[in-house]
């Protein structure tokens, strides 16, 4: 190879990576799933010492999750995205006592969640029950954007009409695009076929 070509090629090999990395942006993602209304965490409440950490066997709990989110946002200079992958309802007495008030969604918003999707247990009360939950949450205050991308509504049955109307109102969206620190972030949520409660779930 001629020396006249070596110098330009070496020069380009040095500056091109710098140009590429100059446009690099960092994003921190905090993700949760299957929280099932377990506000108090796991372990007897008598073991819980809220003013210290590492002094008890209690794990989880929404207050601790909120603390992690708050501290992470404070520590990081880059944008922080907070999402939940579903099953935030059901599983504890808290939900059963006030199951259609859906204060879980309002708490998630207060904790700093940007978006959530629906898991199979959000459908435990059937489409009509989920529609009432989402409507109640929306009417009671701000909630994270709910994203659900593979909903298919029946054209023969009216049992899912209320939930379909929720989608039409935009309470649940098929996808979401957010901007954080110059980044455009696309979010969508999927529920697998294996989550179908019927015998024909694999069809």
Model-derived features: positions:
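Acidic, metal/ion-coordinating pockets
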Residues: 21-203
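Short amphipathic alpha-helical "recognition" segments used for binding
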Residues: 6-7, 22
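Positively charged n-region of N-terminal signal peptides that target proteins for export
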Residues: 1-5
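Bacterial N-terminal signal peptides
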Residues: 7-17
